[in-house]
Structure formats: C-alpha cells, structure tokens
Amino acid sequence: MKVALDLDAVLGDTRPLWEAWLEDAARRYRSIAPLDPSELSKDRGEAAEQLDRWAEGGVGDWHGSLERFTEDHAPVFLRPDPDANAALRRLQSRGDTIGAFTDAPEPLGRLALAQLGAGRRLEVAEFGAGARERVLEALGEGSVVVASRDELLALPL
C-alpha cells in the first residue's frame, strides 16, 4: 500500500504554530518592515510568496526565522500521538510506502514531522504550494490519501 498523509489533518495541526510565528515576526521586525498577519493569504503557499516580498524590505531570510521559532516552540504546539505513531510503525514494518504533505513552508513542516515522531517513518515529505500533488506523484499510481487521524487508524493493518 502507498499512503499519503495530510500532516495537518492526521498527525498534528501546524497552523497554530505558523500563526504564532507570524505574530512574533510582525512584532520582531516591525521597525524594519511592517507585517500585518491578517492581510496574508490563508493559503500558506501564497502567504510564502507574500512573505518573500515582505522580506525584500530588509528582513532577509524569513525561513531562518521560522525555523528557529519552530525549533523553540514546536514542543508547546505539537504533541506526538501514540496511536497514530503505532499505526505508522505497523505500516512501515509491513513494507508500505508512506508520504506526507502540508502547505506549510519547509522548515515548519520538516521540524513538525520530527517533533511528532513521524519523520523517520516517511519515504517522502513535501511542503508548501503543490505539496499534495508532488507526494502523490512520488508515491505513484494507486496511492491512498489519508485525510484524518480516524482514517489512519482505520487502515487495514
């Protein structure tokens, strides 16, 4: 079986951590380049493009800031789910191919997978705009998209 997991819906929602970083970045960089998180697109792929333009105002590498914030705050926002991780272990042990996707930027998604204990179980992980399509392409035909924790736990193991 080839399984594509929606990271935010199945393993742990990264959006609250993303929103906390946006608030922190708006406060931290307000004297360099004003940022109003409420004006950013809810689609994080589009928001990343908006942040690229914002960073040109003197902020620089916002990805590095997001990575540091995520390293510091992920344990507060994201908790491993023992049942979900057990299901991933069983899938992996029987030779299934597992991928995950999120529209979150790469530093946030990658560190979230590590915090949630899922990173080492995956063959492929994709982040940002078009992540779902890239994971499905990498996994190949016949992939099953898992869109909730309940769907993961209901997979035949």
Where are the regions a protein language model picked out?
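Asp-based, Mg2+/Mn2+-dependent phosphohydrolase catalytic module
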Residues: 92, 110-157
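Phosphate- and divalent-cation-binding pockets in alpha/beta enzyme and binding domains
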Residues: 21, 108-111
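Conserved phosphate-coupling serine/threonine residues in phosphotransfer and NTP-handling enzymes
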Residues: 102-104
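Structural beta-sheet core signal
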Residues: 99-100, 145
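Short alpha-helical
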Residues: 17, 106-108, 130
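Residues within well-ordered alpha helices
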Residues: 25, 50-53, 90, 112, ...
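N-terminal helical cap/lid subdomain that shapes the substrate entry/recognition surface
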Residues: 1-82
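Short, acidic loop-to-helix structural element flanking the phosphoryl-transfer center
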Residues: 72-99, 110
